[in-house]
Design a protein with these regions (language model features):
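Charged, low-complexity, helix/coiled-coil-prone segments
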Residues: 24-31, 86-91, 202-218
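Short hydrophobic beta-strand that contains or immediately precedes a catalytic carboxylate
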Residues: 131-136
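Non-catalytic accessory regions outside enzyme or core folds
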Residues: 1-84
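Conserved structural scaffold segments of CAZyme catalytic domains across common CAZy folds
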Residues: 74, 78-95, 140-141
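Charged, flexible boundary elements
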Residues: 89-122
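Active-site nucleophile/metal-coordination loop of metallo-enzymes that catalyze phosphate/sulfate
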Residues: 2, 110-127, 141-221
Length: 225
């Protein structure tokens, strides 16, 4: 079994993707942006997980040599890509774009969904005990869901998973700034370098500790690479 483990596990994820397709064969036609968000957070994210785990198995299978199975598995990859990229991402992406277009055009965000820029005020400022915030750049929601499941199993503790709408544009320097305490974020272009300011202060990694301490002197920001 060990020799064929990656093939079996890859096929399991294909089966999961096919089952998801059957459950949602009518496509994605949710009429409300908030509901699309809710559906993804509670259900649709599973397709991203299946896709990631399939490719993990596929990449590992390439470390062993089995000419017949390798060729067959590569044909499976084509089917998986069609199902994921065309049907899932294409269909769900269109549904989301259609239902949020008006609000995005008028406000630059969907109003009824929690905003990343409110993170500090909603989750840190009201806390009555010590809070640790770990920021992992570009970590997908479905990976967080898998991590939450693993923490529940290993620690037998209560783990709550939530989501917030990213600031726009959704790039690192804006997202990191949005998590800091602020009343207003502004962008500044100086010597062809774009900076994000929180109430006029730089939010570069070297200054985040200062921004935090300006609100709570007991705060500390640490960077790891």
């Amino acid at each position: 079994y060990e020799y064929f483990r990656n093939f079996y596990e890859g096929l399991l994820q294909v089966a999961n993707m096919q089952e998801f397709f059957k459950e949602h064969s009518a496509g994605f036609h949710t009429p409300d942006a908030k509901q699309v968000w809710k559906e993804y957070a509670e259900d649709y994210y599973r397709m991203d997980t299946y896709y990631r785990l399939f490719h993990l198995s596929f990449q590992r299978s390439l470390e062993t040599s089995n000419i017949k199975l390798d060729d067959l598995f590569k044909h499976v990859v084509d089917k998986v890509e069609g199902l994921y990229s065309y049907w899932f991402l294409g269909g769900l992406g269109k549904n989301w774009s259609d239902v949020c277009a008006d609000e995005m055009a008028e406000h630059g965000r969907v109003l009824e969904i929690s905003q990343q820029s409110d993170f500090y005020n909603e989750h840190i400022r009201p806390a009555d005990s010590r809070v640790f915030v770990i920021i992992s750049d570009a970590m997908r929601y479905e990976v967080a869901a898998s991590l939450a499941d693993e923490l529940r199993r290993e620690t037998q503790s209560n783990v709550k998973l939530g989501s917030m709408q990213s600031i726009f544009p959704s790039i690192t320097k804006f997202g990191m700034a949005a998590l800091l305490p602020h009343k207003a974020l502004t962008a500044e272009l100086k010597n062809e370098v774009l900076s994000v300011l929180a109430d006029g202060q730089s939010t570069a990694s070297s200054n985040r500790d200062k921004v935090l301490k300006g609100v709570n002197p007991a705060s500390v920001a640490v960077s790891y690479t």
